[in-house]
């Protein structure tokens, strides 16, 4: 898996967690107290940016999950 593919997988994971919690991107921004905007959330979720570990940490706090949840990728690597 190359970097671009990995970023997309992580972004999909962030998005699925957010949606499972019935939160909008704007809700997440509000919980992060202005540290990030909806454009950046969208870019993370689409895999178009490589966020810092601090951003991922703050995102995990906003979504009330452990940061490791973003990187739990076993389901993406299972053979069909």
Regions found by a protein language model. Name each.
Residues 2-4, 61, 71-80:
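Short, charged recognition helix plus adjacent turn
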Residues 19, 30, 61:
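Alpha-helical residues within the helix-turn-helix
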Residues 22-43:
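Short alpha-helical DNA-recognition segment
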Residues 14, 25, 38, 53-56:
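Helix-turn-helix DNA-binding elements, focusing on the entry/boundary residues of the two helices
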Residues 32, 45, 55, 71:
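DNA major-groove recognition helix of helix-turn-helix
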Residues 1-20:
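A short, Lys/Arg-rich alpha-helix, primarily the initiator
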Residues 52-69:
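DNA major-groove recognition helix of helix-turn-helix/homeodomain DNA-binding modules
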């Amino acid at each position: 898996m190359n970097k671009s593919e990995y970023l997309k997988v992580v972004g999909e994971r962030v998005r699925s967690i957010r949606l499972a919690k019935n939160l909008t991107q704007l809700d997440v921004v509000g919980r992060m107290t202005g540290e990030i905007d909806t454009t950046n959330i969208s870019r993370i979720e689409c895999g178009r940016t490589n966020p810092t570990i601090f951003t991922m940490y703050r995102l995990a706090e906003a979504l009330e999950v452990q940061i490791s949840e973003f990187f739990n990728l076993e389901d993406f690597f299972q053979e069909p």
